């Protein structure tokens, strides 16, 4: 193993240990000492890569963004999938995204300065264009008619990424579910029913789990 591979392996040990501890104990209760002991990495090594646990969670946020961007691109560009299948693939990804769920449960937005701004910018720059591709596919295939796919994609990103984020809002589960239903109703009203009944059921379950886990 060369030096670059050793460095990568050490960094991953630290991140994996931090992820497990954040999940088990919570961000606030986890110390750098805890992470050092769980990872088996020396004090000098851990501080070589991360000056604080805030830097660790900041890295986790950026890493999660990269994974999300890549997965959205893969789904949007998969010509073998229908619009409904692509939406289902997106939902499945978020359900199974362990790193994202850890960040949500630890209220990531309170931990890193400007994290929300960076997340919104990332979503508009990388994720919205992929959502727009799926909407355009639906129009081309005759599933629905949408004259403003790019604009609708950006609106949906803001609604799901900010308006419905359980970390940002402090609404009850009932209030959150009502807003979800409003989004689905709004899409139906403008003639762009992106979400099937099956997908709507899965999304509602996902948000209920997110709200009860934080």
PLM feature spans:
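Basic, helix-initiating cap at the start of DNA-binding domains
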Residues: 1-25, 29-41, 54-58
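Key DNA-contact positions within bacterial/archaeal DNA-binding proteins
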Residues: 44
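A short His-aromatic
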Residues: 47-50, 54
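Alpha-helical DNA-contacting segments of helix-turn-helix folds
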Residues: 58-64
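Hydrophobic alpha-helical connector segments
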Residues: 59, 73-101, 153-156
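All-alpha amphipathic helical-bundle segments outside canonical DNA-binding/catalytic cores
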Residues: 84-88, 122-123, 136-155, 173-178
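Short secondary-structure transition hinges
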Residues: 95, 99-144, 150
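C-terminal peripheral helix-coil segments that are non-catalytic and often amphipathic
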Residues: 129, 133-140, 169, 173-214
């Amino acid at each position: 193993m060369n030096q670059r591979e050793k460095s990568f392996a050490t960094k991953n040990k630290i991140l994996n240990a931090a992820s497990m501890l954040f999940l088990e104990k919570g961000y606030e209760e986890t110390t750098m000492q805890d992470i050092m002991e769980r990872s088996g990495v020396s004090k000098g090594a851990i501080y070589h890569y991360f000056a604080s646990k805030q830097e660790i969670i900041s890295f986790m946020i950026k890493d999660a963004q990269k994974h999300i961007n890549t997965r959205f691109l893969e789904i949007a560009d998969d010509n073998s999938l229908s619009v409904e299948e692509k939406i289902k693939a997106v939902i499945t990804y978020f359900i199974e995204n362990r790193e994202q769920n850890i960040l949500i449960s630890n209220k990531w937005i309170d931990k890193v300065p400007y994290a929300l701004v960076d997340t919104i910018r990332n979503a508009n720059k990388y994720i919205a264009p992929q959502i727009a591709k799926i909407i355009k596919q639906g129009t081309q295939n005759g599933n629905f008619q949408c004259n403003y796919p790019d604009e609708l994609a950006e609106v949906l990103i803001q609604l799901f990424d900010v308006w419905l984020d359980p970390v940002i809002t402090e609404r009850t589960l009932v209030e959150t579910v009502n807003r979800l239903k409003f989004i689905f109703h709004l899409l139906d009203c403008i003639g762009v029913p992106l979400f099937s009944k099956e997908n709507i059921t899965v999304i509602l379950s996902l948000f209920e789990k997110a709200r009860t886990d934080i």
